[in-house]
Structure formats: structure tokens, C-alpha cells
Amino acid sequence: MNFRQFTDSCFAILSRYTIENLIIDMRENGGGSEGNEDYLFSWLTDHPYIKYDSVELSRFEFSFINYTDYASDSDKTALYKELRDENELTNSGRIIRKRELYKPASPRSNSFKGHLYILTSGWTYSGGAEFCSLVREHADAIFIGQETGGGYYGNTSGTILELTLPVTKLRIDIPILKFNLAVHKGIRGRGVIPDYEVKPSCESFNQRVDKELKLALSLIDK
């Protein structure tokens, strides 16, 4: 079962049994395939929205490409072709993803209408953080945990070049796309800030106590 089939099946169950409270755990969600965050969010809203203000590329070619996992001629050619096919140089000098490639998922008339709780942490990044920003911006949810690692207004992720330093052989992941979200409710330079901050502790870890989940369940019981 793929992600979208799994998501559909989950919300079908929520609808069938008239579930009123939903907890979504995003604490270790570092992202994944672009568009999955849209698909999940489409089940949480019945209103149209704009996801990205823009997706920006710094350049079409990179001077360090021969030290990355795209060093072979075939990989390099394929990467550069993809970058030029998907992006365009604007009059302002910025390289922006072509507008026709923006395809947010359509909102659903039968979206979840109950109480929503989102668990977050510093490991919530990329598509995971984008999902949290969309929920904060367009839905009514309670966030519990720590501030997301990914920024409220966007992040650098997407296509990643794995650079190997020539002397030390240390490997560094370099994301080359800047995702600028079409949002306005957050704080610049910060992630999604929880309504209830729950700080991790060695004691709760050793005792295997999930403080964030415990708090969410206590709020539901009120």
C-alpha cells in the first residue's frame, strides 16, 4: 500500500466511525516525496489554497558538481536537463520553478471536521514542516511538542547534492531548491511554534513516557 492509499484508507475509517479527535504525529517526519504533504492536508480542508509563493533555484549549474553523487557525465547531464526543464530565468534575475508545475491537491468536500492535534519536534522538516505550516495557516489545530526544524515560511530541500570533500572525504548534503510558502501567520526565521511546548527529558526517555501524546490525550479527555 502506498502513502496515498494508506491516507485514503485512514480517513475512510475516520468517516465510517465518526471519529471526532485526530492526532497526527509529525515529530520524526523529515519529509519525503514532494506533494505528499499536500495530499494529506487535502483531507483536512474543504477550501482552496495556494501552497507556494515560489520555488527558487540558485543556479542552473554548480562548480562543485564533480565532487558530488552527480559527477558522472550521464547523471550530470540528466540533472542539468531537469533543472532547465522545470525552472526559468525571470527578468529579475531569479531562477523560479515554472508556474504550470505547481499542482496542489484539491480540497475535499468530505474532509475531516473534528478536533485536530499535531505533534511536532525539531526533527519535523522539509515536507513535514510544510504540512505543519499549511495546517497552522489554513486549519484549526492544536500543536504540541517542540518548534519544527523546518521554517514556517519555507525551507531549502528538494533536490539534494551529496558533496564529498576531496581531502577529508566527509560527505555533506546540499539542498539546492528554496521553497517559499504562501503563508503569513508565522514568525520570520522560526518554525511552527507549538501551542503547548513539551521539552524532551532523559527521564521521560528512559521511562518510555510519551509526554506529547499523553498531553494530547489529556486535552481530548477534558
Regions found by a protein language model. Give the residues of each.
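C-terminal "post-core" interaction segments
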Residues: 1-222
